[in-house]
């Protein structure tokens, strides 16, 4: 099991350059840094090569996360939008591969954040999402990339809200490189049992995000971490565990995540680094790795 952190913990904008954080997370003791793929197509090949070299030099693994926009929605009723989504993913995955990234997770099957001002079609979006992921899975597989479909809470998406729904979706896609992604923040809202949800995902669990119920770093809240760790051990999970804390207001990140108050206790960068280091030690202790 490898432990990582989403670079957005320190940032306010999804478009922020993530390269400078590689050395930081290495010094803090992490194995992985997860980066947002939203703007990766804006990077030049030279920039991508520099980032890849930095990761290798610092012994850091890169993973990626993404919440596609509404105009790139693979489950849209509009065939033109679905086609735009497929083209977007093929370009994005090609650039992700240039960073030697082998895992990308998020609402790949849909878009994020969902617009609930209009009625949603869960069954239709599910079926189109299966078709859409099926349509990019082989392309991703040829690049050595696993697609990890994130199960989100009801307030952020309607298609997949539980581990059981995620498993059914992945089985319907039927591709070996398409996996389930779980996140303790979302599980806290939707699942009756963390342990049961993880065991339901079982061997299909390809990526795992952690955080407290209010998005603080692990160890600063009330999540049943020992239950979570036991379940991960029960299924012999050896993948990435990525903490995804959001504790600062402001910017597109604060707005999209709905962080309306400072959850860091007024922490400066040094204190945020310390909190991340302590959360890593806590995570290794309770979850393993």
From Swiss-Prot:
Binds 1 Mn(2+) or Co(2+) ion per subunit. Its cofactor is Mn(2+); Co(2+). Involved in the biosynthesis of D-psicose. Catalyzes the reversible epimerization of D-fructose at the C3 position to yield D-psicose. The enzyme is highly specific for D-psicose and shows very low activity with D-tagatose. The substrate specificity decreases in the following order: D-fructose, D-tagatose, D-ribulose, D-xylulose, and D-sorbose. It shows a higher level of activity for cis ketoses than for trans-ketoses. The active site is at residues 150, 244. Keywords: Cobalt, Isomerase, Manganese, Metal-binding. It catalyses: D-allulose = keto-D-fructose. Mn(2+) binds at residues 150, 183, 209, 244. It is an enzyme of class 5 (isomerase). This is D-psicose 3-epimerase. Optimum pH is 8. Optimum temperature is 50 degrees Celsius. The activity of D-psicose 3-epimerase is very stable below 45 degrees Celsius but decreases above 50 degrees Celsius with increasing reaction time. Its EC number is 5.1.3.30. It holds the Pfam family AP_endonuc_2. It comes from the Bacteria. The lineage of its organism: Bacteria, Pseudomonadati, Pseudomonadota, Alphaproteobacteria, Hyphomicrobiales. Homotetramer. The gene is dpe. InterPro entries: IolE/XylAMocC-like (IPR050312), Xyl_isomerase-like_sf (IPR036237), Xyl_isomerase-like_TIM-brl (IPR013022). One of its GO terms (molecular function) is cobalt ion binding. Belongs to the hyi family. Inhibited by Zn(2+) and Cu(2+). Substrate binds at residues 6, 107, 156, 183-186, 215.
């Amino acid at each position: 099991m490898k432990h990582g952190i989403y670079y957005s913990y320190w940032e306010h904008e999804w478009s922020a350059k993530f390269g400078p954080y590689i050395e930081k997370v290495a010094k803090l003791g992490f194995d992985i840094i997860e980066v947002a793929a939203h703007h990766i197509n804006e990077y030049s090949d030279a920039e991508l090569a520099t980032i890849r070299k930095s990761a290798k030099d610092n012994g850091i693994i890169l993973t990626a996360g993404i919440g596609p926009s509404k105009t790139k929605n693979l489950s849209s009723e509009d065939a033109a939008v679905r086609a735009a989504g497929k083209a977007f993913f093929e370009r994005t995955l090609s650039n992700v591969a240039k960073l030697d990234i082998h895992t990308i997770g998020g609402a790949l099957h849909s878009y994020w954040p969902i617009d609930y001002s209009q009625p949603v079609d869960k069954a239709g979006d599910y079926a189109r999402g299966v078709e859409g992921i099926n349509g990019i899975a082989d392309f991703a597989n040829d690049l050595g990339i696993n697609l990890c479909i994130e199960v989100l809470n009801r307030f952020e998406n309607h298609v997949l809200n539980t581990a059981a729904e995620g498993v059914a979706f992945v089985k319907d896609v039927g591709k070996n490189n398409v996996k389930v992604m779980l996140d303790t923040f979302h599980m806290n809202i939707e699942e009756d049992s963390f342990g049961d949800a993880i065991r339901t995902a079982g061997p299909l669990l390809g990526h795992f995000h952690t955080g407290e119920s209010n998005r603080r770093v692990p160890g600063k809240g009330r999540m049943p971490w020992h239950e979570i760790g036991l379940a991960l051990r029960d299924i012999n999970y050896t993948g990435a565990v990525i903490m995804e804390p959001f504790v600062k207001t402001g910017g597109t990140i604060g707005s999209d995540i709905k962080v309306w108050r400072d959850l860091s206790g007024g922490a400066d960068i040094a204190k945020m680094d310390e909190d991340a280091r302590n959360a890593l030690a806590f995570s290794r202790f309770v979850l393993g790795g």
